[in-house]
Amino acid sequence: VHLSDGEKNAISTAWGKVHAAEVGAEALGRLLVVYPWTQRFFDSFGDLSSASAVMGNAKVKAHGKKVIDSFSNGLKHLDNLKGTFASLSELHCDKLHVDPENFKLLGNMIVIVMAHHLGKDFTPEAQAAFQKVVAGVANALAHKYH
């Protein structure tokens, strides 16, 4: 992902203000509620029968933290997203058979949740930069697909 110095600064500033585990849990939870067909990958997570069940589910929260920790690591390697996410791409492609379109949906959920959490601190410039990043991460995660 090619980012200007201003975009990198906007990302660093915004990311420094969020509680990553909360963003990850809420973003994954929202993905499962808004796009219920994505729940099929999480059969072992227990009750996902309603929005409140999903958003309160401890396994959703824990996996959301794993997801956002990987995303956060990607923010440290913006010049090599494909390399950074290569093993996760392979896992999601070869073993889990996740539709790569879901990565784009989750990226958008991350941006939405960040906007919700940061309010006015999530400037249009920060949003534009994060949209580039989540698109780059989705592309990197889809890289191993044939």
UniProtKB/Swiss-Prot annotation:
The modification S-nitrosocysteine is found at C93. Keywords: Acetylation, Heme, Iron, Metal-binding, Oxygen transport, Phosphoprotein, S-nitrosylation, Transport. GO terms for molecular function: haptoglobin binding; heme binding; hemoglobin alpha binding; metal ion binding; organic acid binding; oxygen binding; oxygen carrier activity; peroxidase activity. Red blood cells. The keyword Oxidoreductase does not apply. Residues 2-146 form the Globin domain. Heme b binds at H63, H92. The modification N6-acetyllysine is found at K59, K82, K144. SUPFAM superfamilies: Globin-like. GO terms for biological process: hydrogen peroxide catabolic process. GO terms for cellular component: blood microparticle; haptoglobin-hemoglobin complex; hemoglobin complex. PROSITE patterns: GLOBIN. The modification N-acetylvaline is found at V1. InterPro entries: Globin, Globin-like_sf, Globin/Proto, Hemoglobin_b, Hemoglobin_oxygen_transport. The modification Phosphoserine is found at S44. Heterotetramer of two alpha chains and two beta chains. Belongs to the globin family. Involved in oxygen transport from the lung to the various peripheral tissues. This is Hemoglobin subunit beta. It comes from Spermophilus citellus (European ground squirrel).
